[in-house]
């Protein structure tokens, strides 16, 4: 039982008509520690009990069993609970130290599978900074869901089909150099693609060539198939370098092409349900009752669209993974598309359509400017990660020039800084990226949290890594209590982040815990020889464990030394 549950349980004994869960939801955390650790507002009871909230608060407070609390006091319409710092703090520390790897875990998911569509770059194009958000938000959500006992399935739905590949093949036929492609695949292919698009203004026949090549690809022409497979293979090899740097694995790379032979079934099902209507030669589904535009399934030339392909993918994923939830971590600009996807599945009679969730996110800008991909102007993610690693290396050199594994730490700090900066922001907000700000060791940054963890590890090394087995642990003083209390809030933060698909809650939590620990460190002689030394070191160990765990949920490493 965590601290919030402890307070809710005490309230439930005097409010038996309300569940512990309902009471937990009503509890507030006072901003000022003088008002206690938890506050219970009584306004909502006034109508039912026909009494003023202040009177209700006083009457309830008199009935509450105060054992396990330092005190319970009334403040107007609120009942303020002060937890017993020494005993509750000791219990929190003991819980962390007993099983650090599983602290904060809970069985919210009951091993239910959750498919997560994330990253999904286009082959033969560089991964730009725009791909960072879907990739790291999706991965963090997967980690958080795993922590509450869901089974995440990371799906990289590659953009590996479409008329653009016909254009690329036409460009390669005209200007391609195999050796040049082998040397630098994605940038070279991107160069060809930009060239044919730029020159198509003066040479409209290039568009015709592109259509001809794509028609060959659709018809299974051996040369078109060979080029397509080669472009896909070299692109994926390049992407894997970035994914390895980010330390992200995928369970599936089934992209758009995988569903080429699975869309006819979708159209047949829609025909059987008599859902298709003709509109100017195209086939659509009327979604007026959902307040949505008609969903186009087949164009007048008989070709299918993204929605048809995504319907095929949705059916395949449900059959393959029997998911409890199916998430699509895609920019907010695609909200209408996923609303249509969900509505069409519902019209098809699939009750599991309510398991489909679009996880939108805001745009990313660089130094206050929008990032453009027109005419090849792409800010490449790999370049930004490498620049961040270099900057981290410089700062480590200044702070700790004798650090043994400086290159590895620089990579963990540099990459972690980029990931953390994205994830500390609420995902629906737009994010501005300024490299120099992102890699700072102070302020609301990833390196600040990593440095707090490394500081805790340094203290534990100096103390000879003591054993806490069998020790009676307590928490002494307000600053120590603020740290312990924050540690005790880890599980509820994880549960909320899982329910809201919001990794920023973990990012903000990690920053808050690091800040509380740094304040404690600044005002406490942790290694002083007295009867509280082991408890102080236990607090430091718990901070180290929980910061490492929180960073791991975000996909960020926690170096032991910096």
From Swiss-Prot:
Its EC number is 6.1.1.19. One of its GO terms (biological process) is arginyl-tRNA aminoacylation. One of its GO terms (cellular component) is cytoplasm. Keywords: Aminoacyl-tRNA synthetase, ATP-binding, Cytoplasm, Ligase, Nucleotide-binding, Protein biosynthesis. Its main location: cytoplasm. SUPFAM superfamilies: Anticodon-binding domain of a subclass of class I aminoacyl-tRNA synthetases, Arginyl-tRNA synthetase (ArgRS), N-terminal 'additional' domain, Nucleotidylyl transferase. This is Arginine--tRNA ligase. It is found in: Cytoplasm. Belongs to the class-I aminoacyl-tRNA synthetase family. One of its GO terms (molecular function) is ATP binding. It comes from Limosilactobacillus fermentum (strain NBRC 3956 / LMG 18251). It catalyses: tRNA(Arg) + L-arginine + ATP = L-arginyl-tRNA(Arg) + AMP + diphosphate. A motif ('HIGH' region) lies at residues 121-131.
């Amino acid at each position: 039982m965590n601290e919030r549950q402890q307070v809710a349980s005490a309230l439930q004994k005097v409010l038996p008509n309300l569940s512990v869960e309902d009471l937990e939801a009503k509890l507030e955390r006072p901003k000022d520690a003088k008002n206690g650790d938890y506050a219970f507002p009584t306004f909502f009871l006034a109508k039912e009990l026909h009494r003023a909230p202040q009177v209700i608060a006083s009457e309830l407070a008199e009935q509450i069993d105060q054992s396990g609390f330092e005190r319970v006091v009334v403040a107007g319409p609120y009942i303020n609970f002060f937890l017993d710092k020494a005993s509750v703090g000791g219990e929190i520390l003991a819980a962390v130290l007993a099983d650090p790897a599983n602290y904060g875990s809970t069985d919210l998911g009951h091993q239910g599978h959750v498919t997560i569509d994330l990253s999904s770059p286009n082959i033969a194009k560089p991964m730009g900074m725009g791909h960072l958000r879907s990739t790291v938000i999706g991965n963090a959500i997967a980690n958080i869901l795993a922590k509450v006992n869901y089974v995440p399935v990371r799906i990289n739905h590659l953009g590996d089909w479409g008329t653009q590949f016909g254009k690329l093949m036409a460009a390669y036929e005209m200007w391609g150099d195999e050796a040049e492609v082998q040397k630098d695949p994605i940038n070279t292919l991107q160069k060809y693609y930009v060239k044919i698009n730029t020159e198509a203004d003066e040479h409209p026949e290039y568009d015709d060539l592109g259509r001809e090549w794509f028609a060959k690809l659709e018809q299974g022409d051996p040369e078109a198939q060979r080029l397509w497979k080669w472009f896909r293979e070299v692109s994926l090899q390049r992407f894997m370098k970035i994914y390895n740097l980010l330390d992200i694995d995928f369970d599936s790379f089934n992209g758009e092409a995988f569903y080429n032979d699975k869309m006819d079934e979708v159209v047949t099902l829609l025909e059987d349900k008599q859902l298709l209507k003709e509109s100017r030669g195209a086939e659509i589904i009327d979604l007026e009752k959902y307040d949505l535009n008609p969903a186009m399934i087949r164009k007048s030339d008989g070709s299918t669209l993204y929605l048809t392909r995504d319907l095929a993918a949705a059916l395949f994923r449900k059959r393959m993974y029997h998911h409890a939830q199916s998430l699509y971590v895609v920019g907010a600009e695609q909200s209408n598309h996923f609303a249509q996807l969900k509505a069409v599945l519902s019209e098809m009679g699939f009750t599991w359509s309510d398991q489909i969730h679009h996880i939108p996110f805001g745009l990313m800008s660089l130094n206050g400017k929008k990032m453009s991909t027109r005419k090849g102007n792409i800010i490449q993610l790999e370049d930004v990660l490498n620049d961040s690693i270099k900057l981290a290396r410089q700062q480590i050199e200044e702070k700790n020039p004798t650090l043994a594994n400086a290159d590895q730490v620089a990579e963990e700090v540099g990459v972690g800084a980029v990931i953390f900066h994205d994830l500390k922001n609420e995902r629906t907000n737009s994010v501005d990226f300024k490299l120099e700000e992102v890699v700072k060791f102070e302020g609301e940054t990833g390196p600040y949290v990593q440095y707090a963890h490394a500081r805790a590890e340094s203290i534990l090394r100096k103390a000879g890594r003591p054993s806490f087995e069998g020790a009676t642990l307590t928490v002494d003083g307000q600053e120590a209590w603020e740290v312990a209390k924050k540690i005790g809030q880890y599980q509820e933060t994880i549960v909320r982040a899982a329910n809201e698909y919001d990794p920023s809650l973990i990012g903000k939590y990690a920053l808050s815990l690091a800040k509380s620990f740094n304040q404690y460190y600044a005002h406490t002689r942790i290694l002083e020889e007295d009867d509280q030394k082991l408890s102080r070191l236990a607090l430091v160990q718990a901070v180290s464990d929980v910061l490492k765990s929180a960073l791991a949920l975000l996909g960020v490493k926690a170096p032991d030394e910096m």
